[in-house]
Amino acid sequence: AVTLNVLHISAYNLIYEEGTALWRMREKGLVKECEEEESLQMFETLIDVLGFSGYEHYEISNFARSGRYAFHNTSYWKGVPYLGLGAAAHSYDGKSRRINPSSLSEYMEALQTGHVAYMEEKETVDSLYNEYILTSLRTCWGLNLKKLEDDFGVERMRYCLEQALPHIC
C-alpha cells in the first residue's frame, strides 16, 4: 500500500466469522490463527512503517496521508448524523440508528411497495454518552470535555473525569 501511494489505509485485525469460507479453512487446519502476541507485534510494525512513510494514525485502525480521513467513519466517531442508502446501510439522525435490510431483494421490494423496511433503535442519553466516550477515545482527537459538558451536562462530564483520573499518567 505504501508503494502504491494510497492516501488512506484501514487496517483491521482479521477475525474468523462462523459460516464463512475462512472459518471453515481454519477449522480444517488450512489456515492458522495468529497468537495474540504475534498479532500485536504485527500491528506495532504496521504503525511504525506507516508512520515512517508519512501516514497519520488518526484512529485505532485507520491511517491517512495529508489529512485524507475517511469522511463516513470520521462522522461516525464524532457523532455527526449521516444517511446510509442501499441494502444493509446504516443511518444516524442524532437520536436513533436505522439499519436497512441486508437482503437486496427484501430492500428493493420494500422500496417498490413504499414500505418502511429498516430496523430502528432509539438512542438513550446513556447510550449516546457511552458511545461518545468510546468512539472519541479511538481517535487522535480524543475526548472534548466542552462537548461532553454541552451535550450531557456538567455532572456527567465530571463523572467521566473522576473515572479517568486514576488512569492518567
Report the location of each language-model feature.
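Short amphipathic alpha-helical interaction segments
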Residues: 153-168
